[in-house]
């Protein structure tokens, strides 16, 4: 039985479902490559979205190749006074996102939601002793297209002593509206 969506999630409801598509990734000292990706946003009745992403290289024949990475986490909405920042010149913080990576690091993002667009900046990045030395990230997610059925995203990453720069971007089609 499907849980009823928590009312605080209305602002993020446009993300719900399963998204699939193609993207491109590249970083200094790494050859650029195409990938296929699946992202799922689900809910379980609690005041957060469950998030899961899986990425595979694209083979020369266009088929799905070897796994590249995955990540999972939770998207939480801030409401009322909790969304307001101490500095009135700063935009409110609408969402907190926690994402963990098998490369041995986790990120806590703070972000804003406007219409069908989410912009996230890392607040904290922690890693294991042997984890990828990630220092900061910026992500942008948004719907576009005639029926707003395409989820575009861009991920900038600062890692391996490099400054924040483009890392991955993709255009994904909604293939399942299940929430």
From Swiss-Prot:
Chain location of the short sequence motif GXWXGXG per the record: 17-23
Top-level division of the source organism's lineage: Bacteria
Residues annotated as transmembrane: none
Family matches, as Pfam families: THAP4_heme-bd
CDD domains: lipocalin_heme-bd-THAP4-like
Family membership: Belongs to the nitrobindin family.
Protein name (Swiss-Prot/TrEMBL): Ferric nitrobindin-like protein
Organism: Thermobifida fusca (strain YX)
Lineage: Bacteria, Bacillati, Actinomycetota, Actinomycetes, Streptosporangiales
